[in-house]
Amino acid sequence: MAKENGKVKAFFHDVRTYWKTPPEGKYVPYREYLSIFGAVGGDYTLQYLCGFLSFGTGCYLVAFYYQIPLLTFAAINTFFIATNYLWSILSMGVDANLGFLPKKVERKYFAIYLSFAVLGLLMLFFDFSAFLPDGVRLALDSKWAGIDAVGFFKIFGAYFLCNGWGGFRGIVIRKLLLKKLGRYKLFAYSNIVQGVTVAVLICWLPLYELPMTERVWKLFLLFQLYGMFAFTGHTQKVAFNISPNQQERLFVNSYPVKLSHIVQNIVNFLLPTIAGALFVGGISDRDTFRYLLPAFFVVSAIIMFISLGKIKERIPAPPIEKKEYYSFWTCIAGIFKNRYLWINSAVGLLDSLGNGMLNMKTILLIYTWRETGLLFSVAEIVLKFAGTPGQLLAPWIRKRFQYKTLMVFSQIVNAGRSVIYIVAFLFLGKLHWLCGILLFIAYFLGDGLTSALKIAQNDMNIRISDYQMYISGERFEGYQGIIGWFTGPITSLVGLIIPLMFVSAGFTSDWDVLYMDDVRIKCMIIGIAFDLAGYILMMLPYIFFWDYTDEKHVEIMKELQARADRLGEETNAPQQDAQIKEPAPTGETT
């Protein structure tokens, strides 16, 4: 006991001593921990609230009130498989260079972005379907539920407008605000007002009164604008990269970041409870979206921004004025050498077997227990708490187990949980409370046993960027999604399997059919079986190919530090006027 008291006293002594200035070897003073708590807590809460609004089956507003056909979402996603590559190329080039491009390159970017923005506006204001032959127009009118020839062009217009204008706007914002706000904070500041405004429009506009074909494209336009003004997740990125010190970074993400979930948990409790008390439909009632959601958006945004300005970004990087310009092919060559990105992409491809699966918490709470009020709130909080002990112990667990071991263990747990889900639906599916209790226990235990992995994954993503710098001279974070070019089309096609099988089981766009035991049981067993197959296959790449150990990372960091020291010794050499320019053919920084 005396020993434990001594540790507590030593901790509080350190807090007082290093309140404003961190100890040697560390970077984050304890005072900043409070700011991280508030900023990340507000950000997590906003992400929770944003989760209620999505152009997909998981959105109550879209599913219950707009009744968009299930296959409409999949059809729209397939429209843009090819064009997504163009936007990926452009955005990766901008992100990798932080928006600071040579003048000639910048003019080309602006020409492409603004051309598509103008084309999108024309498609939205004029009926392009009038130029189609009657046969083609008739085919478009009858091919997809909820989409006709007019709506087809409007959907493309919304897509082109938001991607074109969003790309142009992104370059301008970076050039104006990046030096002042940092690479992660700038979009949180510049998007919040527009993002919340569009969210309120989605909640308030009476689009459900429109014909289905008009309703679909107007909803799609609103959600494209909503995505263009994304304002969440940026604060988390600051916290994930808060310190070059590995253990300090893990500590920050295990304690102040994890404890900040308290803010979200309060909203998790209040929102469904108030909705259940005020509105007949509870959390899924339309008035919840009209009145409660906007109010919680505003309060959460205020909480985040009060603390956000007090957090510092500590990413080792040269001054913007001295930053090299890296061409597309230089970045591609560097990314293709990173074997760990390939392994993660292979795992993601295998994980797509479960794409289209219904949310287990929704099925458990609404369609099995049939709760939307107080019990819904309490159950959600308990399930979210399941991962807390593991995440608080993450630094201790990560010290003692390699990342490979944690990944394999996690997939074993997920596979076991899927087996329990199948047993619950197969044998207890019509006994609602017994089935729900078994689902609840399996969900809780699964999250509890795998929770430490979430923090370990965030840390590993940073280590993979360290490895990228080790092999190519730059982190190329904006290009790390390029391997998705190869896996993305396959993922989209695989994602059609479960929705098509749901249709054969009797579930299309009417979610009320999930209250029917036979339909719900059949749909859940189908989806979980695909999930189970994915979890088993996801173990294999880590077992046979992953060799990024902690010891290897230590050696990489030593080499990176040695390179930084050598470059530091060269800073006194005569320099020409700094300008953004093409790198040497090797792709190395100078």
Annotate each PLM feature.
Residues E4-A573:
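Membrane-embedded alpha-helical bundles of multi-pass transporters/translocases
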Residues N572-T590:
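Intrinsically disordered, low-complexity cytosolic terminal tails
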